[in-house]
A protein has these predicted regions:
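N-terminal redox-cofactor-binding region of secreted/periplasmic oxidoreductases
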Residues: 1-521
Length: 521
């Protein structure tokens, strides 16, 4: 059967595109997902259903692609990505945070004039039901969207949240009541898409609205070998995909092919299909359909590591209780980039992996330091021409000295907060970052290189931009330059990573490009 739209990847954006495009009953949509699909909340495995109220680990789950990457100094880090309907929104930390106004206005200034903050504001509101502002949403919040957003009221904050906030306020950071309002900075409650601890993914919020439709077909456990092209005309046109289901190959045709496989899957699939840097494709014997140098380049993420404190025996630690309640956004001293630093205060910290993993024996609390708008960029390359093999990810993390300077200063700022009376009241010691690691810039850099990981916000690997930008892969409507019938709509098209967790922004990309398609762009 031939479909109007074949969407590859049922993740944060793909599930939204499928839901919005299938609102027209005259259009047939096929949504393909590499991982499994679950019909409802009650069917979800524990590690997918619950954000942190889980005793099982998402890290080693079949619902995680379990990628590896080189971070810095040859170190290997884990890169979890969702392999299930809902994509990474179904396995992430449920932080429902918008970028700041300038993030999106910068996209517009880079030649994507329909992506400014004011253009996107209706979509931020459209995707959400913000329980905090439900009765009075105003101009900056939604009260009728598919994704439920909550915050922990101050009177429910755990000791670590309270102590960290007190210390940050006394250090001069302002209080931020609403981190999703435009141009906010400071310390305050963290917005989360986890009502009652349930990870409210796009599979729940969006596919829950659309999976009954007869014009939407959802097929799970399907891998894609490559996109097919008709090259008989002047401009190659995407006509379908070769899909593998239970070991059997199928050719699926569509009037338009939309790749929403994420910032790793989408550029990998493009290159396997002959769309990417020509010399790199030829290394693996792949016929080049279109030489697009920007595919896999410009890789961005947020370097992140934890400063952990062992708490006193009197402080109760619940490994399946609230893990995240407050955050701090601030501008590094001497930085020209506003809000270039972010801190997530975490409860039930341990030696174990932190994000999404509650199968731990907690020892205390921690502050996760993230660097926004890193100047260092990474790249994604093929590891082989086999669609079953993972790509090679080199994050090139903190390679720029200004990145390292800002990060060093951020670690020292967090350490300084431990001297506040509220922090001293609950912490016993700092077990993993020793005083000797702080004695010099060189010692601290060495510690950072051994410990830094990622906030799991990989993006920008097939960025959108005007055709005059040699590294732009798509135009601002998501259409791949120099090809017909092929569109991208996920974190890969971001021109620059936002100063926030990216899940909200990726959902907005799904909504925005769905509207572009409906409008005939």
């Amino acid at each position: 059967m031939k479909y109007d739209y074949v969407i590859v990847g049922a993740g944060s954006a793909g599930a939204i595109l499928a839901t919005r495009l299938s609102e027209n009953p005259d259009i047939n949509v096929l949504l393909l997902e590499a991982g499994p699909d679950y019909n409802g909340i009650e069917d979800l495995p524990e590690e997918v259903k619950y954000g942190y109220k889980s005793t099982t680990s998402i890290w080693d789950s079949e619902h995680n692609w379990q990628y590896k990457a080189t971070s810095i100094a040859g170190n290997t880090i884990d890169i979890p990505r969702g392999k299930v309907t809902g994509g990474s929104s179904a396995i992430n930390g449920t932080i429902f945070l918008r970028g700041i106004e300038e993030d999106y206005d910068d996209w517009a200034e880079a030649g994507n004039d329909k992506w400014g903050f004011q253009d996107l504001m209706p979509y931020f509101n459209k995707i959400e039901t913000d329980k905090t502002y439900e009765d009075n949403p105003g101009d900056f919040h939604g009260s009728n969207g598919p994704i439920i957003c909550v915050r922990y009221p101050e009177d429910t904050w755990l000791p670590g949240s309270r102590a960290f906030t007190d210390a940050a306020l006394d250090a001069g950071f302002p209080f931020c009541e609403d981190a999703n309002a435009p141009d906010t900075t400071g310390v305050g409650p963290l917005p989360l898409n986890s009502p009652d601890g349930i990870r409210w993914s796009t599979a729940i919020g969006y596919l829950g609205l659309s999976r009954h439709r007869l014009n939407l077909t959802i097929r799970a456990n399907v891998l894609i070998k490559r996109v097919l092209f008709d090259t008989t005309g002047d401009t190659p046109r995407a006509t379908g995909v070769i899909a593998v289901s239970d070991g059997e190959e199928f050719t699926v045709e569509g009037d338009e092919i939309i790749l929403t496989a994420g910032a790793i899957g989408t550029p990998q699939l493009l290159m396997l299909s002959g769309v990417g840097p020509q010399a790199h494709l030829e290394e693996f014997g792949i016929e080049c359909i279109k030489d697009v140098p920007g595919v896999g380049q410009n890789l961005a993420d947020h370097p992140l590591t934890q400063v952990t404190w062992k708490t006193k025996p009197t402080v109760e630690l619940d490994p399946v209780g609230p893990r995240l309640q407050v955050l701090l956004r601030y501008t590094a001293e001497g930085s020209e980039i506003e809000n270039d630093m972010i801190v997530y205060m975490q409860h039930a910290a341990s030696r174990a992996r932190e994000l999404g993993d509650s199968f731990i024996d907690p020892i205390g609390i921690s502050a996760g330091l993230g660097l926004n708008l890193a100047l260092s960029k990474g790249e994604l390359k093929l590891g082989s021409a086999d669609y079953r093999d993972p790509p090679v990810l080199n994050y090139n993390m903190l390679d720029d000295q200004e990145d390292m300077r800002r990060y060093r200063d951020g670690i020292r700022m967090l350490v300084s907060l431990e001297n506040h009376p509220s922090m001293k009241e609950i912490i016993e010691n700092r077990p993993y970052l020793l005083d000797s690691d702080l004695e010099s810039d060189e010692a601290l850099e060495s510690w950072i290189k051994k410990n830094v990981g990622t906030g799991h916000h990989i993006s920008c690997t097939a960025k959108m931009g005007p055709a005059t930008d040699p590294m732009a892969v798509t135009d601002q409507y998501g259409k791949v330059h120099g090809l017909e019938g092929l569109r991208l709509a996920d974190a890969s098209v971001m021109p620059e990573c936002v100063r926030a967790n990216i899940n909200v922004t990726v959902m907005v990309i799904g909504e925005r490009i769905a509207d572009f398609i409906k409008q005939g762009h």
